[in-house]
Swiss-Prot record:
Active-site residues, as the UniProt record annotates them: S106 (phosphoserine intermediate)
Gene name of this polypeptide: glmM
Co-factor requirement: Mg(2+)
Reaction catalysis annotation: alpha-D-glucosamine 1-phosphate = D-glucosamine 6-phosphate
Protein name: Phosphoglucosamine mutase
Matches recorded under HAMAP family: GlmM_B
MF terms in GO: magnesium ion binding; phosphoglucosamine mutase activity; phosphomannomutase activity
PROSITE patterns per record: PGM_PMM
Pfam family name, one: PGM_PMM_II
InterPro entries assigned to the protein according to its UniProt record, in alphabetical order: A-D-PHexomutase_a/b/a-I, A-D-PHexomutase_a/b/a-I/II/III, A-D-PHexomutase_a/b/a-II, A-D-PHexomutase_a/b/a-III, A-D-PHexomutase_C, A-D-PHexomutase_C_sf, A-D-PHexomutase_CS, Alpha-D-phosphohexomutase_SF
PTM notes: Activated by phosphorylation.
Length: 458
């Protein structure tokens, strides 16, 4: 399938269905050459790029395609194999690599795949670099090819996951263990299926694993951070202390308390922000949240004297606002949490360790830590769409939004936006009465589906 390759990058790298543009082998080879071209523009000479992936079946072909493009331009590549996205960011820094590449479509189904690119400092590349890569791919002008003796070598790094495991454990206080904790862990059959059980078990927790048998086609399938109902049931069944659900590439975290209640990213951010403030480790008493963050959570944080900077949805925007405001903690409802004291991107395993540390140090259950946070009633519905038409151009949609806003008045809010990574329109309604919020959200969903819907919403 062909597509204009002048715009490859979305809100989180390149993403799409495998074997459809832009996620084809042909375009991936060009991307590899373009990444090399950008590095060589900065300075000539030897360069090193690390390449990791999640467990999708298509990961093999994209790994080989990217490496072919990179090595053809004289770049040395290091294959990490299956490893979480934050692991690639960490290894990029640890190996003093010039760039890191993660092959993953994160929480998307197995049929999709994607490419995330990190600079040498472990942060995702910015828009200017993305645009330069796109220009090179479109023009196919990558610079001079090296002589035959100067093409790049490819090596497999055998201890990449071991290094990441040790790094993750090092974020947990020395002298403390997880002894006595029974943890239900769901790795979504994804990139954390080896490293996450090892991290928690080596810290002496009892770990009951779900989603740790990847087939290449079962990543995120009814499991992981997008399907916490799996561990809700398991926590009760196994009488566990806590449940931990990660997504396919390991940068999201959703938890479940000992009573089987879901603790989402908003709640986890509140727990960690409160702890950092108590320890005087929260600069300017500031955290970064998003427009999706529950009003009840915002009120709770403000009651603690914590300032909240609001960013658009997406970990790139959260990180940008963190850097601009010198914040060390930011996160979003979906479970992305960034601890800049530890890593340069969202890290589900490290985030879980911080929550577990707080539980242990405060001698509290997870339900104890959330008891004082009262969330506002909120409905969030994902509507599959056929195309992303500008919402302001849809008269019927704008009409129903106006009607719902009049019903809510000043006591609620509506957020309607397209996903940056999927053909989905997200409908969020928040108010004071749960039944009213659900009903109003359904009213909006019905109109959106009638206008641009592609199937059953969820």
């Amino acid at each position: 399938m062909t597509r204009d390759v002048s715009q490859l990058f979305g809100t989180d790298g390149v993403r799409g269905r495998a074997n459809f543009e832009p996620m084809t082998v042909e375009t991936s080879v060009l991307l590899g050459k373009a990444i090399a071209g950008v590095l060589l523009e900065k300075h000539a000479g030897k360069h090193r790029v690390v390449v990791g992936k999640d467990t999708r079946l298509s990961g093999y072909m994209f790994e080989n395609a990217l490496i072919a493009g990179l090595t053809s331009m004289g770049i040395e590549t290091l294959m990490l194999g299956p490893i979480p996205t934050p692991g690639v960011a960490f290894i990029t820094r640890a190996y003093r690599a010039d760039a890191g590449i993660m092959i993953s479509a994160s929480h998307n189904p197995y049929r999709d795949n994607g490419i995330k690119i990190f600079s040498s400092d472990g942060f995702k590349i910015g828009q200017a670099v993305e645009e330069r890569i796109e220009a090179m791919v479109a023009s196919k002008d990558f610079g001079k090819l090296p002589d035959d003796h100067a093409v790049g070598k490819n090596k497999r790094v055998k201890d990449a996951t071991g290094r990441y495991i040790e790094y993750a454990k090092a974020t947990f206080p020395k002298g403390r263990t997880l002894k006595g904790l029974r943890i239900v862990l769901d790795c979504a059959h994804g990139a954390t299926y080896r490293v996450a059980p090892s991290v928690f078990e080596e810290l002496d927790a009892e770990v009951i694993c779900y989603g740790c048998e990847p087939s290449g086609c079962n990543i995120n399938a009814g499991c992981g951070a997008l399907w916490p109902s799996t561990i809700q049931k398991a926590v009760i069944e196994h009488k566990a202390d806590v449940g931990i659900a990660l997504d396919g590439d390991g940068d999201r975290l959703i938890m479940v308390d000992e009573k089987g209640h879901i603790v989402d990213g908003d709640m986890l951010l509140s727990i960690c922000a409160s702890d950092l403030k108590r320890r005087q480790a929260l600069p300017d008493n500031r955290v970064v949240a998003t427009v999706m963050t529950n009003f009840g959570v915002l009120r709770y944080l403000e009651s603690l004297g914590i300032q909240v900077t609001i960013s658009p949805v997406g970990d790139r925007h959260v990180l940008q606002h963190m850097l601009e405001n010198q914040a060390v903690l930011g996160g979003e409802q979906s479970g992305h949490m960034i601890f800049l004291d530890y890593n340069t991107t969202g890290d589900g395993i490290v985030s879980a360790l911080q929550v577990l540390r707080i539980m242990i140090e405060s001698e509290s259950t997870l339900s104890d830590l959330t008891a004082c946070i009262v969330k506002s009633p909120q409905a969030l519905i994902n509507v599959p769409v056929t195309k992303k038409v500008p919402l302001e151009s849809l008269a019927n949609v704008q009409g129903v939004l106006k009607e719902v806003k009049e019903v809510l008045g000043d006591s609620g809010r509506i957020l309607l936006r397209y996903s940056g990574t999927e053909n989905i329109c997200r409908v969020m309604v928040e108010g004071t009465k749960k039944h009213q919020v659900d009903s109003l959200a359904k009213t909006i969903v019905d109109v959106v589906e009638a206008e641009i819907g592609a199937g059953i919403s969820e």
